């Protein structure tokens, strides 16, 4: 029996080290038959990487993080090449250890006080018109990081008066009302919180999270800001059934959510949850039709769709796959 890992502050724990800390153990990929990626899951990389390096340099210069890099998003090259990125605030170490996610786990450092100003300046330098701000979970903070979100929104708007902001927030476990109150005066243009999967799979995929809590967060924000659209994302390929996903869509609509992203789960490494199934594009198309029939005004559904993938186009109602 191996010794438990003693986490050091500010150190990133990934892959096997991260998975060793999860109470619900999952079978390693080498013990299961690994599914081969079908033809529709192949990505064509851009021939010119100049814009990609530009964005990475801007991030490094200001000590900022993108969820695109930290979570090993398959769309990184495409998005960076188009000059878009999803900024990840409050550091790059998460207090949760979800086995589907590639963001590092550990004991994070204190939030950087100058991050809102640095973030706003970087966005201004990049001449962005639409920006997505997300964060790691910060269960170590009394407000879950809500004040930092509010500070970032305020600073971004001061330096970029015509920008539109989408925030992809954590669940603010145990401090929802405090968080919503702190963010009340500096809300985003789109409020996003991902359910990720069906409730049956939460213990396996989202240890520490609660399906009903996440739905309530979306509902309470909508009640507080009835004119701001709310959004949520769900992955497929973790072992859910189509019927379960349809029920998730119904639950989202019942809680006032009008924007949806639905994409294929991809395992970041052999240590993470394995892919149970590759969902064909035709099934995503069917689910999109169901979503629109249920009353979603925006539904981006496809194998490579991610919560912030072409978020600016999603917000305009353009078709994203």
From Swiss-Prot:
Gene3D superfamilies: Aldolase class I (3.20.20.70). One of its GO terms (molecular function) is metal ion binding. [4Fe-4S] cluster 1 binds at residues 68, 73, 79, 308. Residues 80-297 form the Radical SAM core domain. Pathway: Protein modification; protein lipoylation via endogenous pathway; protein N(6)-(lipoyl)lysine from octanoyl-[acyl-carrier-protein]: step 2/2. Binds 2 [4Fe-4S] clusters per subunit. One cluster is coordinated with 3 cysteines and an exchangeable S-adenosyl-L-methionine. Its EC number is 2.8.1.8. It comes from the Bacteria. Keywords: 4Fe-4S, Cytoplasm, Iron, Iron-sulfur, Metal-binding, S-adenosyl-L-methionine, Transferase. GO terms for cellular component: cytoplasm. Its cofactor is [4Fe-4S] cluster. Its main location: cytoplasm. It is found in: Cytoplasm. InterPro entries: Aldolase_TIM (IPR013785), Elp3/MiaA/NifB-like_rSAM (IPR006638), LIAS_N (IPR031691), Lipoyl_synth (IPR003698), rSAM (IPR007197). It catalyses: [[Fe-S] cluster scaffold protein carrying a second [4Fe-4S](2+) cluster] + N(6)-octanoyl-L-lysyl-[protein] + 2 oxidized [2Fe-2S]-[ferredoxin] + 2 S-adenosyl-L-methionine + 4 H(+) = [[Fe-S] cluster scaffold protein] + N(6)-[(R)-dihydrolipoyl]-L-lysyl-[protein] + 4 Fe(3+) + 2 hydrogen sulfide + 2 5'-deoxyadenosine + 2 L-methionine + 2 reduced [2Fe-2S]-[ferredoxin]. Belongs to the radical SAM superfamily. Lipoyl synthase family. This is Lipoyl synthase. It comes from Vibrio atlanticus (strain LGP32). The gene is lipA.
């Amino acid at each position: 029996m191996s010794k438990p890992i003693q986490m050091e502050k500010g150190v990133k724990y990934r892959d096997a080290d991260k998975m060793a800390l999860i109470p619900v153990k999952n079978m390693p990929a080498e013990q299961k038959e690994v599914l081969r990626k079908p033809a529709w899951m192949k990505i064509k990389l851009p021939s010119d990487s100049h814009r990609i390096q530009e964005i990475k340099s801007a991030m490094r210069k200001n000590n900022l993080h993108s969820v695109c890099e930290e979570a090993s998003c398959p769309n990184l090259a495409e998005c960076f090449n188009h000059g878009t990125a999803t900024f990840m605030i409050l550091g790059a170490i998460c207090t949760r250890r979800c086995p589907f996610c590639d963001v590092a786990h550990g004991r994070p450092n204190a939030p950087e006080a100058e991050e809102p100003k640095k973030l706003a300046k970087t966005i201004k330098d990049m001449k962005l018109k639409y920006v997505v701000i997300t964060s790691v979970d910060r269960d170590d903070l009394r407000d879950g990081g809500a004040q930092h979100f509010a500070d970032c929104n305020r600073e971004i708007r001061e330096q970029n008066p015509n920008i539109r902001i989408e925030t992809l927030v954590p669940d603010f476990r145990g401090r929802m009302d405090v968080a919503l109150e702190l963010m009340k005066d500096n809300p985003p243009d789109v409020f996003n919180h991902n359910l990720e999967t069906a409730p049956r799979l939460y213990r396996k995929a989202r240890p520490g999270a609660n399906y009903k809590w996440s739905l309530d967060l979306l509902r309470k924000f909508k009640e507080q800001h009835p004119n701001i659209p709310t959004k949520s994302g769900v992955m497929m390929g973790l072992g859910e059934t189509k019927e379960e996903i349809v029920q998730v869509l119904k639950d989202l609509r019942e809680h006032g959510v009008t924007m949806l992203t639905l994409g294929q789960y991809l395992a970041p490494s052999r240590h993470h949850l394995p892919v149970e199934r590759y969902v064909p594009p035709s099934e995503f198309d069917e689910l999109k039709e169901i979503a629109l029939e249920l009353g979603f005004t925006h539904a981006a559904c496809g194998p490579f769709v991610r919560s912030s993938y072409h978020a600016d186009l999603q917000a305009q109602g353009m078709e994203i796959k």
